[in-house]
Amino acid sequence: MTLYQLGNGKKFYTLTFGCQMNEHDSEVLAGMLDQMGFEKAASEEEADLLIINTCAVREKAEQKVLGKIGTLRYLKENKPDMKIAIGGCMVQQEHVANKIYRDFTHVDIIFGTHNINRFPQLLEHVMQKGKRVKEISQDDSQVFENLPHKREDSIKAWVVISYGCDNYCKYCIVPYVRGQQRSRDPEHIKYEVEKLAKEGLKEITLLGQNVNSYGKDLDQNISFTNLLEELSKIEGIERIRFMTSHPKDFDKELITTLKESNKICEHFHLPVQAGSNKILKKMGRGYTREHYVDIVNDIRAELPNASITTDIIVGYPGEEEEDFQETLDLVQNVKFDSAFTFVYSKRSGTPAAEMAEQVDEQTKKGRIQKLISVQQEISEQRNKDLENTVQRILVEGVSKNNEDMLSGRTRTDKLVHFPGDKELIGELVDVKITRGHSWNLYGEIFEDSLT
């Protein structure tokens, strides 16, 4: 039996934890399995192969994964021929991979982030020889092109422009599990986007741990803004998004590029992490509070309707009440459209995990609750400010909240629910906003847009 016949008559199911990069990797795994003859299962119980794509950014995510792996023991007892594979950032940490291999003997395959291309061969080994395998590569120098994708979404797609990160923020595990920055060749990116356009997709989101530093590791002279300009020329693609931006490498040229484009969406995900210069320095972020505020002011001066979202960590080692108040003050002054807020979580192997002055859990809990309360009020007001305006929406599908409604996003990445015909899915329509809430908007189709 050849490699590309192994999956004939078999089904797979993937559980994905973590960020958009992991979602992209799961699409790659699905593409490989599709080529091998596997079909997607409707549930874990139906699967012959179960893959867990893991996240290592916070301890809570790791504990959740370990708990899930434990429960799969009973599933495999009832279906002994099922194969279980664990991949992603969590098992790129060798001590974690070894623990899972040792403690969870029902797991058949363990593979890391740097050898996802080898998954078909690892699966073949297990299926034909019946032996478990653990393979974690430490070679973070390669970029694998032409890997297959199996995308579920026919409207929008993730497109990776770079892998890894060179920043080594003191709290962050990502450079250790994703490796050094490797920018993809712009021609390969362009080819992928052109292919997506031919398939009828309308929107792409460019992914990188730090999109602003794209190209700095390439021999050719190309910047992120150069890449955006080239991709904007591709016919069929209506919207281009990107994430994540790093304040240290952000420049005004990006703002100008957005202002001059009718395709690149006016949304900046710009993680600030803290509002205290003392904490920013301890984090190794490479910028000050003042520099960050200057970026925000530059964006709003040129693109007043742009949305700005962020990430914030509370309870970082050494964070005193005064530091936290500076973060609250920044939030209240910048008025982010939304914020992903996190309690600091120790990551083994990072400098921050060894720092003195670790903040106690009760203090962290009080601070995160206060921050969420402040930001939620701001988010609600930012969305209420859009009431009675008409927004251009890319209709993504039936609303998850109400199957009688459609949902889609504004150019500024606001989720909007509204009544409409399912034939509009995949189309751009104008919607008049009637209600704004903290996390979403409601509206009705602006009839003039359908005539």
UniProtKB/Swiss-Prot annotation:
What residues bind [4Fe-4S] cluster 2, as annotated? C165, C169, C172
Quote the record's cofactor note: Binds 2 [4Fe-4S] clusters. One cluster is coordinated with 3 cysteines and an exchangeable S-adenosyl-L-methionine.
Alphabetically ordered keywords of this record: 4Fe-4S, Cytoplasm, Iron, Iron-sulfur, Metal-binding, S-adenosyl-L-methionine, Transferase, tRNA processing
Q: Which residues form the Radical SAM core domain?
A: 151-381
EC assignment: 2.8.4.3
Q: Which InterPro entries match?
A: Elp3/MiaA/NifB-like_rSAM (IPR006638), Methylthiotransferase (IPR005839), Methylthiotransferase_N (IPR013848), Methylthiotransferase_N_sf (IPR038135), MiaB-like_bact (IPR006467), MiaB_methiolase (IPR006463), rSAM (IPR007197), rSAM_horseshoe (IPR023404)
Query: What positions belong to coiled-coil segments?
Result: none
The role this protein plays is: Catalyzes the methylthiolation of N6-(dimethylallyl)adenosine (i(6)A), leading to the formation of 2-methylthio-N6-(dimethylallyl)adenosine (ms(2)i(6)A) at position 37 in tRNAs that read codons beginning with uridine.
Q: Can you name this protein?
A: tRNA-2-methylthio-N(6)-dimethylallyladenosine synthase
